[in-house]
């Protein structure tokens, strides 16, 4: 559920960038400039529902990963796919559906061992950063749902200020309508 919520937000951001037809950088083919990298910390630890969502998107195949190849320990398993499958949430259920229009390029790195979040960040920058050579990177934890244009605005901060080394967005609690009034700290 948390992973799907994050991915839905990321997919909507990619759609938004593709809708910016008057942009010199973005527009109809913007999806070709964006790669969604998912790094999961430990094959034994990955959430089964997350694995199912990744398999449904086409970027993961269960049963292929091995602990060793030719007697040597495997560090990570890397899957790559350009998906045209979308998702929607109905309660806590994830429903996959065909996407109309915007494909999403995905890389999924399933680390063999659980080595914590900082190691996953290092994997992302050292393994994929060198190959992809991105202009910017946006790191999101599973469960964080970006607004439909928030990744664009982060990119824009870097584009307008090329000497900028980092930027962060705002995180709001996701509460159902009227729940904010129950807790006076949240309501304030």
From Swiss-Prot:
Main subcellular localisation: membrane
Keyword Protease appears in the UniProt entry: no
Stretches of the chain forming a coiled coil according to its record: none
Catalytic activity from the UniProt record: [(1->4)-N-acetyl-beta-D-glucosaminyl](n) + UDP-N-acetyl-alpha-D-glucosamine = [(1->4)-N-acetyl-beta-D-glucosaminyl](n+1) + UDP + H(+)
Compartments (UniProt record): Cell membrane
EC number: 2.4.1.16
Topology of the protein relative to the lipid bilayer: Multi-pass membrane protein
PANTHER family: CHITIN SYNTHASE (PTHR22914), CHITIN SYNTHASE 1 (PTHR22914:SF9)
Protein name: Chitin synthase 1
